[in-house]
Amino acid sequence: MKFMKKSLVGIIMGSSSDSRIMHAAAEILDGFDVPHEDQIISAHRTPTRLEEYAKHAEKNGFKVIIAGAGGAAHLPGMIASHTVLPVIGVPILVYNDKQQKKSAFGGLDSLLSISEMPTGSPVVTVGVNKAANAGIYALKILAIESSSIRKMLKSHKEKQHKSVLKESQDLKR
């Protein structure tokens, strides 16, 4: 398996249908000029590839992995079981491709699968379909060692703060 060497974050998902959600994590990282590598790796259909990816992630320069999955959502936990890198899990609300209906559990199945990992293989879990929050959390992890990312995150928070103040002022008019 070939991996890019300069990426700091691995963004993986169980299938191409997850990409519309996981794109939000990539957009956040792109906004901070943080290189990432995006791949589809299925815990159930490509288990050998999953193991290889996880075992080589640190050697290939990754600092954190964002893993999105729907349904039984084993991908984040399986990745976490094969690496010491932090793994951020994104539960994805699954849609039935043929009928365009949401899963019967509304994403709760994925949320519980990812958040209820056994002791020793933890996965940080964000809300259902909240890949952007996974991107922000990955930046916070990277900011521990990178003063430039830390500075950009502080600026981002300040912009959010000002935006809310402006919205509040506009509401009073």
Language-model features, listed with the residues they occupy:
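Structural motif
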Residues: L8-I11, E37, H44-K55, K63-I65, L85-I88, ...
